[in-house]
């Protein structure tokens, strides 16, 4: 059986690895897209919006609702990508905890 000191060392090592993975993830960028890529939204891995792009074809003053829907679609797509990457990157640590 592992003694308490070894468990603490292992937990600290895992914490440092996890912090590094979180920093790596935060530095990444994720771009979500709407249908036909008419709207794109780019976020950092820590969910900060860094850019949004509208293709000319979607900008219609008579149809603002479509632009709103596509913007929502692009944002949700990017956030889903971030959640999946976070789960994949940090989920591995759950099984490594020494307790």
Swiss-Prot record:
Cellular-component GO terms for this entry: bacterial nucleoid; cytosol
Top-level taxon: Bacteria
Any GO MF annotation of the entry: DNA binding
Keywords: Cytoplasm, DNA-binding
One Pfam family named in its UniProt record: YbaB_DNA_bd
Subcellular location: Cytoplasm, Nucleoid
Keyword Cytoplasm (UniProt): yes
This protein's record includes keyword Cytoplasm: yes
HAMAP family, A to Z: DNA_YbaB_EbfC (MF_00274)
Family according to the record: Belongs to the YbaB/EbfC family.
Function: Binds to DNA and alters its conformation. May be involved in regulation of gene expression, nucleoid organization and DNA protection.
Subunit structure: Homodimer.
Record PANTHER family: NUCLEOID-ASSOCIATED PROTEIN YBAB
Protein name according to UniProt: Nucleoid-associated protein SpyM50270
Provenance organism: Streptococcus pyogenes serotype M5 (strain Manfredo)
């Amino acid at each position: 059986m592992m003694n308490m000191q070894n468990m603490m060392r292992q937990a600290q090592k895992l914490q440092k690895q996890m912090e590094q993975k979180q920093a790596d993830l935060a530095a990444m960028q994720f771009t979500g897209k709407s249908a036909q890529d008419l709207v794109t939204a780019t976020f950092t891995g820590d969910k900060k919006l860094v850019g949004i792009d509208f293709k000319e074809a979607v900008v219609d003053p008579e149809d603002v609702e479509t632009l709103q829907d596509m913007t929502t679609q692009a944002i949700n797509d990017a956030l889903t990508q971030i959640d999946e990457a976070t789960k994949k990157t940090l989920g591995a640590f759950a099984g490594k905890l020494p307790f």
